[in-house]
Amino acid sequence: MEELVGLREGASKKPVPLQELWGPCPRIRRNIQGGLEWLKERLFRVGEDWYFLVALGVLMALISYAMNFTIGRVVRAHKWLYREIGDGHLLRYLSWTVYPVALLSFSSGFSQSITPSSGGSGIPEVKTILTGVVLEDYLDIKNFGAKVVGLSCTLATGSTIFLGKLGPFVHLSVMIAAYLGRVRTKTVGEPESKTKEMELLAAGAAVGVATVFAAPISGVLFSIEVMSSHFSVWDYWRGFFAATCGAFMFHLLAVFNNEQETITSIYKTSFPVDIPFDLPEIFFFVALGAICGILSCGYNYSQRTFLFFLKANGFTSKLLATSKPLYSALAAVVLASITYPPGVGHFMASRLSMSEHLETLFDNNSWALMTKNSSPPWAAEPDPQKLWLEWCHPQLTVFGTLVFFLVMKFWMLILATTIPIPAGYFLPIFIYGAVIGRLFGEVLSVAFPEGIVAGGRVNPIMPGAYALAGAAAFSGAVTHTLSTALLAFEVTGQLVHALPVLMAVLAANAISQSFQPSFYDGTIIVKKLPYLPWIRGRQIGSHSVTVGHFMNCALTTLAKDMPLEQVIQVVISTDVTQYPLVETTESQTLVGVVKRTHLVQALQTEPASWAPGQQPCLQDILANGCPTQPVTLQLSLETSLHETHNLFELLNLQTLFVTSRGRAVGSVSWVELKKAISTLTNPPAPK
């Protein structure tokens, strides 16, 4: 029946299946279909990618806002239960601890039961994917559902566990971008393109940051610094477009829900604009950056060492392998018990939410000077108008609570990063850096109670400005990024401290990048993800080492004149993804590349036996339609390690063949590059 055709009515007279003509209302259906085709042609004239970028930004903003809305209600319910349960310490302790324990156990169990790749931040995996490596299941839609549910439960624990959502949201946004890329391919009818896919994934990473902090500019720059060593200008513009759409939609939803009167910054500050800081304070901001850089080295080293310890220890490794919810519950009990307000939690402002932590830390006034002559009593409930009093306790000074917070949260944050749940780790270190800056600013305000005199004018010390600089410097040093300075400006709406904050971030990064890998690179090292290490410094001699010193000389080639039996033996005995194709066995002149999958399919179509004297060779298989690829890029024996590393990073390569006067003599892959860089960085001891 489908082979029968009729004539379409009208002037075109195009043949159509009779089944279409026999359907109900054929003329109306044809008109609607024609109208949709016309609309599609007009809309896609400007480029279909832009519509999918708008959809990406809007979808992620809706998910982010819906998650914030739901989590806010759940956190308020927990606080209400804690207040209304009475004065019994046992019941209040149980209401404070059982809640996060149950949520984290469910988050771990649910996400891990669906897919193990849903745990953690997700940024290290996204960073690996953007280099061209295919990681199975990391961009599947089932991983998206597990990540959303698990992350919602994690964030519902509030400041008790002290975790954020930046990393998982980058992962979620990249998953949405991958899905929209597949929809785009089917809609437009184009063949799948790896380049197009990577463009959308890069834009998705920027949207993930922008929809968390409603900060499009720093969102794009942060995603570039964290996840790319080289970045295309074309992706730069697309990332800004999608991130702006997401941030605008996020602000718009807040205005429509009466949470904001208009589009404004997330954290309100009121730094003076006339003379926000004096010239001598530049030295203090740089010193603060140096302190943050030193502490970030200790944090990254301790966190990575603790992860290695958990993997090496028999008990914890077995617990994490077989009973992840139990490990999550045990860690939650420890963290919740320490933050219990009537216990030691009242020395670390545990009754404040993470947003309230930042709002109080960015306060202009000096708490040390305000409480110098009087010690305010510890209120039974936080005063919404004086939340900064949560940092003041009669038994400790402001300095005592800030120092206690830094000491306790240092190892508590490290413990929280080991819990196998979907969670972000950027906001906790951002707050930790703000506390460092606040402590530094309070010390200066006591050292200079009247302010700094310069040019005949007295300028008071503002600890809130140092908290802002500390947040940007410490988080930037931990992640090896400079865009955290711009992020601090966007979330506070203040640019008056642009120069000192940027100088603090530069000082912190100068120290941290010299001694330790970033937080995300450390996770890549621990998880053993396929990722190229950086070549740091010129002293290691990467320009003097050539490809001939570290290439893989055991190269398996396929010659066009090779008999089919030998070709089959080569395919069976090796497991490489592609074979270099040479002209003849004697010449070994490299002429192309044949993929293993294509070669296996071609061999399967060949007959099982041949007549005597008629056995074909590889040339016959290629002539029958087995596709080959040209060698567009190859290395010579004199190419330096530094140039090879740059090529692999810039073009997202996995393997390159080495030729000498046209002859294939070896290959270089990530394995050889890693070994060569490791040998230069850590040379073997002389015997």
Curated annotation (Swiss-Prot):
The chain crosses the membrane at residues 51-82, 91-111, 141-160, 161-180, 236-255, 282-310, 325-342, 400-420, 421-440, 500-520. The lineage of its organism: Eukaryota, Metazoa, Chordata, Craniata, Vertebrata. Homodimer. Interacts with BSND. It is found in: Basolateral cell membrane. Residues 1-50, 521-687 are cytoplasmic. CDD domains: CBS_pair_voltage-gated_CLC_euk_bac, ClC_1_like. Anion-selective channel permeable to small monovalent anions with ion selectivity for chloride > bromide > nitrate > iodide. Forms a homodimeric channel where each subunit has its own ion conduction pathway. May conduct double-barreled currents controlled by two types of gates, two fast gates that control each subunit independently and a slow common gate that opens and shuts off both subunits simultaneously. Assembles with the regulatory subunit BSND/Barttin for sorting at the basolateral plasma membrane domain and functional switch to the ion conducting state. GO terms for molecular function: chloride channel activity; metal ion binding; voltage-gated chloride channel activity. The gene is Clcnkb. Belongs to the chloride channel (TC 2.A.49) family. CLCNKB subfamily. Residues 551-609, 626-687 form the CBS domain. This is Chloride channel protein ClC-Kb. GO terms for cellular component: basolateral plasma membrane; chloride channel complex. One of its GO terms (biological process) is transepithelial chloride transport.
